[in-house]
Design a protein with these regions (language model features):
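Positively charged n-region of N-terminal signal peptides that target proteins for export
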Residues: 1-4
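Bacterial N-terminal signal peptides
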Residues: 6-15
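N-terminal module-boundary/linker segments of secreted carbohydrate-active enzymes
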Residues: 20-44
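Domain-level detector of nuclease and nuclease-like folds
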Residues: 32-34, 46-213
Length: 213
């Protein structure tokens, strides 16, 4: 009994020390909303992993990679927090927009802990941010893989979201594929200019873009 009590005290003081060090949860300047085109991720690595996200029955297009707290320069991650981690039920409820409960868990652990929110509130805000940005329907109409410049993707999002300006969005590519669209949002989820470290515009003129499965 004495050793159990001692172990509990060690854990409590260790947790208190962790909260006293590192990046402070809830202290950041704005959010980055990251959207990933699921068919491209599946072609690059998801199929090789046997990810259920890539099964055609899900009909995934733009999924929510994450909602990331951001500084004007740099970003926090894995922040010490007293907030309880999400339950399995919570992460499963995010599968419809995040593709997998595993991604939802990872995003909470790396980014949600820095939001200052509870897991439930972080997921609710993430869903709200996802719904706030219109995803151009034109990409769901593709019936075969195409090659296109990232600028085409960016322009489609700008046209679909009148409140967005070019300095509020960036499109990334990876291994020859369009990878992600990232939109910078205020704490109230209004579009704001991105910091220079967020802007990573893909300069390739012919990145692959796969159709919905």
């Amino acid at each position: 009994m004495r050793w159990a009590l001692l172990g509990l005290l060690v854990w409590i003081f260790g947790a208190m020390a962790a909260l006293a060090n590192g990046e402070k949860s809830g202290e950041f300047d704005y959010y980055v909303l990251s959207l990933s085109w699921s068919p491209n991720w599946c072609a690059r690595e998801g199929d090789a992993r046997g990810s259920d996200q890539c099964d055609a029955r899900h009909d995934h297009g733009w999924i929510l990679h994450g909602l990331w707290p951001q500084y004007h320069q740099g970003w926090p991650s894995y922040c010490p927090t007293a907030k309880a981690p999400p339950s399995r039920a919570m992460t499963r409820q995010m599968e419809d927009i995040q593709g997998s409960s595993g991604l939802a868990w990872h995003q909470w652990k790396k980014h949600g802990t820095c939001s200052g929110l509870s897991a439930a509130d972080y997921y609710a805000l993430s869903r709200q941010a996802y719904d706030r940005i219109a995803r151009p329907p034109v990409f769901r109409k593709l019936d075969k893989a195409v090659k296109l410049p990232a600028r085409v993707v960016e322009d489609a999002f700008l046209d679909a979201n009148p409140g967005l300006e070019p300095d509020m969005i960036t499109v990334t590519c990876k291994h020859g594929y369009i990878e992600e669209v990232r939109v910078c949002l205020s704490r109230d989820l209004d579009p704001v200019p991105c910091g220079r470290d967020v802007i990573r515009d893909c300069t390739a003129s012919d990145s692959l873009f796969d159709p919905i499965r």
